[in-house]
Amino acid sequence: MGQASSHMRRGRGGHHLDGGVRQRRKRHIIGGPLFEIEPAESYTSDDLNYSDPDSRVSKEHDDESLRDVKLKTTDVPDWSSYTTVYIGYPIWWGEAAWPVNAFVRANDFSGKTVIPFCTSASSPLGSSASNLAKLASTGDWKEGQRFNSSANTQTAEDWVKQQS
């Protein structure tokens, strides 16, 4: 989100549950590379059915020890070259999706401006962004932004411009 230049590199890390079209659109808005936060064991539609008490996310919600989701990788190519990082995630029970926590714990955000944003049809950003900042304990974390399901590309582009 935003423009890349020789003195500043921007990137976006995010856990997403949508398809490639949305990913290409996000890359266009960012103007920089994307890094997908991918659980080692992908979440299926059934896993994400929060109204089913036997679903994976419901069990993880009820038992915090299950929330330590292993990721395929936490190594972002050229991580040290980034000065601004956007972290996007869906909201689960008022918090960032569990895989995002694992990514944040595994990386050093020293010297980086971190701009969190979330997507949710109904839940607010809440304390999800400040909780991620506490997990990271490094970096200059900015106030987060929630985008609802009706947000369009122009809304996201306008927000990114405000961050620059």
Segments predicted by a language model, with ranges:
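Surface-exposed, flexible loop/turn segments at secondary-structure boundaries
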Residues: 40-42, 122, 149
